[in-house]
Amino acid sequence: MYDYIKGQLTKITAKYIVVEANGLGYMITVANPYSFTDCVNQQVTIYLHQVIREDAQLLFGFHSEEEKDVFLKLISVSGIGPTTALAIVAVDDNRGLVNAIDNSDITYLMRFPKIGKKTAQQMVLDLAGKFVEAPKEESSKPPKAKQQGNEQLDEAVEALLALGYKATELKKIRAFFEGTSETAEQYIKSALKMLMKG
């Protein structure tokens, strides 16, 4: 099992990033690949969780140990796999998640992709009181330069599809942001907030 990887970030796609370490390129699935845009060709530390299946070995990556801890707690719940847990982590609203679990807010939890009523109830049963709320880390990232709006929006929609959101949901999101100019990362963050509001 791997705890973390240190290496050069060489590639970003809508579904994963590639980190080169010791001459090997590791394909790492992350919640929001575009949050790493400023790190391309730089040294990064990515916290890892490895999933070994009959047909594949998968690496899931996180910005921090806290983010990884949330992911690990989520996949301990029956009915939540790594992809669904990653979609929940992508929303980047730990306070909202913890409040929903601790207050049995099933409706809020069901807004996440692939979370039905039974799974939401199971989340409450399994995770209530298990999260220690950490203060949100101040971002040390410099502000990103805005790029071509439509291309960035396309990349954001592709990343949201990879997280399990439906094309019909994203059609409204695309229409809302059409004509604006943001980075893919910002589109994803804004879209996730909108999707969670319902």
UniProtKB/Swiss-Prot annotation:
GO biological process entries: DNA recombination; DNA repair
Key words, A-Z: Cytoplasm, DNA damage, DNA recombination, DNA repair, DNA-binding
Stretch list, region Flexible linker: 143-147
GO molecular function: ATP binding; four-way junction DNA binding; four-way junction helicase activity
Primary location group: cytoplasm
Region (Domain II): 64-142
Comment text on domains: Has three domains with a flexible linker between the domains II and III and assumes an 'L' shape. Domain III is highly mobile and contacts RuvB.
NCBIfam families: ruvA
Function: The RuvA-RuvB-RuvC complex processes Holliday junction (HJ) DNA during genetic recombination and DNA repair, while the RuvA-RuvB complex plays an important role in the rescue of blocked DNA replication forks via replication fork reversal (RFR). RuvA specifically binds to HJ cruciform DNA, conferring on it an open structure. The RuvB hexamer acts as an ATP-dependent pump, pulling dsDNA into and through the RuvAB complex. HJ branch migration allows RuvC to scan DNA until it finds its consensus sequence, where it cleaves and resolves the cruciform DNA.
Name of the protein: Holliday junction branch migration complex subunit RuvA
